Regions:
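N-terminal targeting signals for export/organelle localization
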Residues: 1-43, 209-210
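Short loop/turn microsegments at loop-to-beta-strand junctions
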Residues: 41-42, 64, 164-165
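A short beta-strand-turn-helix
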Residues: 44-64, 88
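Short active-site neighborhood of thiol/selenol oxidoreductases, capturing the structured segment around
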Residues: 57-84
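Hydrophobic beta-strand anchors of alpha/beta hydrolase catalytic cores
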Residues: 65-66, 100, 167
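Structural microenvironment flanking redox-active thiols in thiol-disulfide oxidoreductases
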Residues: 79-139
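Thiol/disulfide oxidoreductase modules built on the thioredoxin-like
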Residues: 135-192
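Short, low-complexity, Pro/Ser/Thr/Gly-rich segments in the mature regions of secreted, periplasmic
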Residues: 195-210
C-alpha cells in the first residue's frame, strides 16, 4: 500500500465507519477506555511478526501507544496509524521511550507478513501483534476495546471486522493517560498524544511538562 493511497482515504469514510462501530459497541456491554483508568496492559499470548513475544520486563519504563485494527480496514486504521507516525516524529528523541503497538483484531486473515508490510508503510517503529482469536479477545478486553466479526457472504465466507477505534496511551504504571478517538484527523491525534505524554508528570527526557 502506497503512502499516496493511504493519504487519499477520506475522513468522511472514517467517520461513517466510526458511527457504525459506536452503534454496535453501545449495546455490546464493552466498556470505553477512560483516562486515569488502571488496566492490565500486558500482551500475554500475542506475538510480533517474527513470532516473538514482547519482553514485558523491558516495558517497565516505557509508555505503550496502542491501537487495534486490521490490514483490510478501509479508512479508520490508516488514518490512526498516520497520526501515530506524526506523533513519533514530533516527539523526536523522546519517541525511544514509547512502544507503538498495532494489535490485529483479524488474526485469521492478518498474517505476520501482511502485518509487517502494513505497519511499515506508516512507521517501521510500530510493532504489530497477533495471536489466537482467544488471545486477541482477551487483550482487547483488557484495553476496553470492542470488536466483532460480521459475515458478509455465507457462501464465500467473506466477513468484515467492526471494532471500536481509539489510540490509547498507557503509562509505565499501566494507567491510561488518554484515549483518543481514531476519527480525529491525524494531526490532531499526534498533537493529543504529544500533549498527553508531556502532561503525564515529567516529560520523558526529564523536562517539566508544557
Amino acid at each position: 500500500m502506497s503512502v499516496a493511497l493511504i493519504v487519499s482515504l477520506t475522513v468522511s469514510g472514517a467517520l461513517a465507519a466510526w458511527m457504525l462501530i459506536q452503534t454496535l459497541s453501545g449495546g455490546s456491554g464493552a466498556s470505553v477506555p477512560r483516562a486515569g483508568e488502571q488496566i492490565d496492559a500486558s500482551f500475554a499470548g500475542l506475538r510480533d511478526t517474527s513470532g516473538a513475544a514482547l519482553d514485558e520486563r523491558a516495558l517497565a519504563t516505557r509508555y505503550r501507544l496502542v491501537t487495534f485494527g486490521f490490514t483490510a480496514c478501509p479508512s479508520v486504521c490508516p488514518l490512526t496509524l498516520m497520526g501515530v507516525h506524526q506523533a513519533l516524529e514530533q516527539l523526536g528523541p523522546d519517541a525511544a521511550r514509547i512502544l507503538p503497538v498495532f494489535v490485529s483484531v483479524d488474526p485469521e486473515r492478518d498474517t505476520p507478513r501482511s502485518l509487517s508490510a502494513y505497519v511499515n508503510a506508516f512507521d517501521a517503529r510500530i510493532v504489530a501483534l497477533t495471536g489466537s482469536p482467544q488471545a486477541v479477545e482477551r487483550v482487547a478486553r483488557q484495553y476496553r476495546i470492542f470488536f466483532d466479526k460480521r459475515t458478509l457472504d455465507a457462501n464465500s465466507g467473506s466477513y468484515a471486522v467492526e471494532h471500536s477505534a481509539f489510540v490509547l496511551l498507557v503509562d509505565p504504571q499501566q494507567r491510561i493517560c488518554v484515549a483518543i478517538p481514531s476519527t480525529d484527523p491525524p494531526a490532531q491525534i499526534a498533537a493529543r498524544i504529544v500533549r498527553a505524554i508531556r502532561a503525564s508528570g515529567a516529560a520523558l527526557n526529564g523536562n517539566t511538562a508544557t
